[in-house]
Structure formats: structure tokens, C-alpha cells
Amino acid sequence: MDNKVAKNVEVKKGSIKATFKAAVLKSKTKVDIGGSRQGCVA
């Protein structure tokens, strides 16, 4: 059970990083309100 939780946390961390990276890239090319808000939440 603990192993599963740890794996879930790792996956979540990875997806947050990916989302944040995408949001940063998006805001660099053009200001996207949705992307910026998502980036702040992450």
C-alpha cells in the first residue's frame, strides 16, 4: 500500500512539472490566460 502511494506521489510530481513547463513555454510564446492560471495553481 505504501509503495502504491509513493508511486502516485511521484507520478503527480512529474505531471505537475510537465504542466508547469508547458505553461511556462506557452506564456513565453503568447500570454494564455488559462495556461498562466494553471501554472500558478501548480
UniProtKB/Swiss-Prot annotation:
Its BP terms in the Gene Ontology are: defense response to bacterium; killing of cells of another organism
**Sequence position, cross-link Thiazole-4-carboxylic acid (Gly-Cys):** 39-40
Task: Cite the propeptide residues by number.
Answer: 1-31
Q: Which UniProt keywords apply?
A: Antibiotic, Antimicrobial, Bacteriocin, Thioether bond
> What is known about temperature dependence?
Thermostable.
Post-translational modification remark? Synthesized ribosomally as a prepeptide that is post-translationally modified to the active peptide. TfxB, TfxD and TfxF are all required for this processing. The chromophore is probably a six-membered ring derived from the cyclization of Gln-38.
Description of pH dependence: Sensitive to extremes of pH.
Glutamine derivative: which positions carry it? Answer: 38
**What does this chain do?**
Antibiotic whose production provides the bacterium a mechanism of host root nodule competitiveness with other invading inefficient strains.
Supply the name of the protein.
Trifolitoxin
Naturally occurring in which organism (per UniProt):
Rhizobium leguminosarum bv. trifolii
Classification of source organism: Bacteria, Pseudomonadati, Pseudomonadota, Alphaproteobacteria, Hyphomicrobiales
